[in-house]
Design a protein with these regions (language model features):
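An N-terminal assembly and electron-transfer interface module characteristic of large anaerobic redox
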Residues: 1-853
Length: 853
């Protein structure tokens, strides 16, 4: 390690937080080789936590993430040249049989939240580097680190942002430093594994017992684990970390969950290893607010209990009272003693029976390999149940027999048409109800209650239908989308399969609807190009109808007229959906736009516009968001909900957008760009109609949305709704809807960053923005949600009276008296009351070409 005086290129500060507990040996070796003095933030303490508490954008994020704020503050106080905390989407894959090697959304992108919310970074001009880096790809990593440190950082310094010392960094130096860092990282992990093997050998030789304290790397922080390793050791156990033994065996696959997070792969492997040993048991550490652990805890529990092992989980957060933990550990000790007594009795009985010739010796288990150890050979001591989970495929015969395919509701306007597209293609698709409070109760019965609200609602919809008696379960299947990303949504399918088995229906096929290969095979369910095209038109039409309905309904001259017009055109669209093409889709849209554009309205544009963004299901599903659009309209406002299609375009655009930061396949990029161009071609005629209309606007293209997002964060933030959520808020502000409800499931991991964490920066860039984040889950108080929304709306109305954030280019009537033709600027507006002089001036200035007689 170089001291600051020995380092020709200055000092780099690294926070002792999150994935640095995994990656620090790599970064220490890398920067030391380049000639930097590496300064690690001080050890965590309550003081560390308190130092960062004012900058935390979300109180429901996990304790390890909260702690990182204090570590950055510690480095700011130490005046290092720059702070290094890269965003790492993928770890290096340790188990080639695992589905992927993601970091969780918080570990991946929380440095973004730190940069946007710690005021000292901006106020003191701190150089805080948090680039996305392809940590999993050695070649791409060399390219990216050279760009960040030798090109971008120098340019920033020349612009007055940061300070660069010493000689210019060359590409060959970066390459050599990366090679050295890979070697140091490999030695670090080999040392941990060797120490784990030696400790296990000691346990074996001395007749001891070990506890695998399984969690994530940052659970090794004594402040985060609250000295639990020492507590367990005080009871006479040897304590192992999950990564010290996970290399010794791999789980049999496929396991039930989609194994796509690298730290989790270790949990499943070490749980499997524990089931093969009499001298090991496992305690899992779970941080409060870690939604992914709702998946891992269930899976680890299944692996252990299937083999007769005891599962124990300890939830930890900032509260350090270990009384409950001591009780759980003592309970585990008592249970282990009981098990040991039973094993001894069984062994004694078996020995006596064998001596009498009444029983044959037990044959060695075929599931007892010698493990891949470097120093020792560890044999399985006990039989272990298979971890493989059988999948039931949806066959062509099932399709031909007309199986009912249950599809959970997400976006009622759009899915109403998508259902007809699939039915026209020969699938007996049954769309489940959109108003289904019983589904919430069913979900809570079958799903770990720490999982996110959409997971509960999706699983609950299906299980309520399964248990309703409405369907012939011998001819029923389920379809669910899988994104393949690092959000929990990819594991909806695992939750549904678990619920079906627990309800006694493991034979029901669960079909994966996904654009990526995730190990699912359903020969009876194929998405053809024709079906895909019609589905896109269905979503496009849903977006158009949603915009027009929400735009007109608050001002309809005749109550119910907007809904009646909506139902008329939706009925026509349902009949047309299985035959949708560019011609008939465009013709139907032309007629619908003309009808909505000319329907009689009263006081058009006199109500504040309130945008609705957020996690995709909560944003669109009325049950999930407690009918938020109805609430907005009931409070005298106009709802603006960005369309559904953009979510799919966002997903398709990521390969192109992340190529410089993370690298991506040229073939994938070309394919996705071709699809985006095709969709743009499909919707261009209708966009032109919307632009020519008096009341409506065409949505921005996805490339424009990405550029908006870049003003706040990296477009590599692409887990969940990712950068699109931020872009939608910016777009709403730009189009006269600065009042925004950010709907999100309680503890939605991506939304901690791309939702809650960006609000402060949006307010800084756009002082007129009026944003409220509202959490939704089964236990959330609807009264609390309503109070937060009503408070935001009261501010919206006050701002509208003052002319703040008011921008409606296409609304003439609001500013023109229909009788005299004089500018009224909201006088006697039913929503706002008399207008101020400031409002009159503001409206006159902003309306521009929108004023028509």
């Amino acid at each position: 390690m170089l001291s600051p005086d020995e380092a020709p290129r200055g000092t780099v500060g690294i926070p002792r937080a999150l994935n640095m507990y995994e990656n620090y040996p790599f970064w220490h070796a890398f920067f030391t080789r380049l000639g930097f003095s590496v300064q690690l933030s001080d050890q965590s303490s309550k003081k560390t936590y308190q130092a960062g508490i004012e900058s935390m954008p979300s109180e429901s994020v996990c304790y390890p993430a909260k702690m990182s704020h204090g570590h950055v503050m510690n480095l700011i106080d130490r005046d290092v040249d720059f702070i290094w905390m890269p965003c790492v989407r993928w770890e290096r894959k340790e188990d080639p049989t695992a589905g992927n090697c993601y970091n969780c959304p918080i570990v991946m992108s929380y440095p973004t939240a730190l940069a946007l919310n710690i005021d000292e970074i901006r106020e003191q001009n701190i150089e805080f580097l948090y680039p996305f880096v392809p940590y999993h790809d050695k070649t791409e990593l060399k390219r990216r680190l050279y760009q960040v440190l030798a090109v971008d950082r120098v340019a920033d310094a020349e612009a007055g942002r940061g300070r660069v010392r010493g000689p210019k960094i060359t590409r060959s130096e970066v390459d050599a430093a990366v090679n050295a860092a890979f070697e140091a990282d490999a030695r670090f992990h080999e040392d941990i594994q060797t120490m784990g093997e030696e400790a296990l050998k000691w346990v074996e030789d001395h007749g001891g017992h070990g506890i695998v304290l399984a969690g994530r790397p940052y659970h090794n922080d004594p402040e985060i684990n609250h000295a639990l390793p020492e507590l367990i050791s005080s009871f006479g156990f040897a304590v192992f970390t999950e990564d010290s033994l996970a290399h010794l065996v791999k789980p049999e696959r496929p396991i039930r969950v989609v194994d796509q997070w690298m730290y989790h792969s270790r949990l499943y492997a070490v749980a499997r290893f524990v089931t093969m040993r009499n001298d090991l048991d496992l305690i899992q550490l779970n941080s409060f607010g870690c939604g992914l652990d709702a998946l891992t805890t269930d899976q680890v529990q299944e692996i252990l209990e299937a083999s007769g092992k005891i599962y124990t989980v300890l939830k930890i957060d900032e509260v350090s009272n270990l009384g409950a933990a001591r009780i759980r550990i003592r309970s585990l000790m008592a249970a282990l003693k009981d098990q040991e007594a039973e094993r001894l009795a069984e062994a004694t009985a078996a020995g006596e029976a064998y001596e009498q010739g009444d029983a044959a010796p037990v044959a060695p288990s075929t599931d007892a390999p010698a493990f891949a150890s470097r120093k020792y050979t560890f044999e399985a001591q006990r039989e272990s149940a298979s971890t493989a989970w059988p999948k039931v495929p949806f066959t062509e015969q099932m399709r031909d027999e007309g199986y009912t395919i249950l599809c959970p509701q997400m976006a009622p306007i759009h899915f109403d048409l998508v259902k007809e597209v699939f039915r026209g293609a020969g699938y007996n698709l049954e769309l489940l109800p959109s108003t289904d409070h019983d589904a919430v109760e069913a979900g809570l019965r079958y799903v770990n209650n720490d999982i996110c609200y959409p997971s509960i609602l999706v699983t609950g919809q299906i299980m309520e239908a399964i248990e309703s008696g409405r369907y012939d379960l011998s001819k029923t299947a389920v379809v669910i989308s899988q994104t393949g990303g690092g959000c929990r949504a990819t594991n909806y399918i695992a939750l549904i399969r678990k619920a079906l088995r627990e309800s006694g229906h493991p034979e029901i096929p669960v079909i994966s609807l996904s654009a990526v290969a995730l190990g699912e095979d359903n020969p009876g369910f194929k998405i053809t190009p024709a079906l895909l095209k019609q589905a896109v038109y269905a979503v496009l039409f849903g977006d158009v109808m949603m915009q027009m309905l929400y735009r007109c309904r608050p001002y309809e001259a005749t109550p119910g007229a907007a809904n009646a017009l909506y139902e008329e055109y939706m009925a026509r669209a349902r009949k047309l959906a299985p035959k949708f093409n560019r011609h008939n889709y465009t013709k139907l849209c032309r007629e619908a736009i003309r009808a909505f554009d000319t329907m009689p309205l009263v006081g058009e544009g006199t109500k504040p516009r309130v945008g609705v963004v957020g996690e995709i299901l909560v944003k669109f599903h009325p049950t999930a968001n407690n009918h938020v659009v109805d609430v907005i309209e009931r409070e005298g406002c106009e709802a603006v909900v960005p369309g559904l299609l953009d979510f799919f375009l966002y997903s398709m655009s990521n390969a192109e957008l992340q190529k410089d930061e993370l690298g991506s396949s040229a073939t994938t990029r070309a394919g996705m760009q071709a699809l985006i161009k095709l969709v743009d071609w499909m919707r261009t005629p209708v966009e032109e109609m919307l632009e020519k209309s008096r009341r409506f606007e065409a949505p921005e293209r996805i490339g424009t949305m990405a550029e908006k997002a870049r003003t706040v964060l990296s477009v590599c933030n692409n887990m969940g709704e990712g950068w699109l959520l931020t872009a939608e808020m910016l777009d709403l502000i730009d189009h006269g809807a600065p009042n925004i409800i950010c709907t999100q499931p309680f503890a939605c991991l991506p939304n901690h960053v791309v939702g809650k964490a960006v609000i402060k920066e949006l307010r800084r860039q756009h002082p007129e923005s009026n944003i409220v984040a509202v959490d939704y889950d089964p236990g959330a108080s609807e009264v609390n949600q309503l109070n937060r929304i009503k408070l935001m709306i009261s501010v919206a109305k006050e701002n509208m009276r003052a002319g703040k954030g008011f921008k409606l280019e296409k609304v003439a009537p609001l500013a023109m008296d229909e009788v005299t033709g004089q500018m009224r600027a909201h006088d006697d507006c039913v929503s706002c009351g008399p207008a101020s002089e400031e409002a009159v001036t503001s409206v006159a200035k902003r309306l521009g070409r929108g004023i028509k007689k």
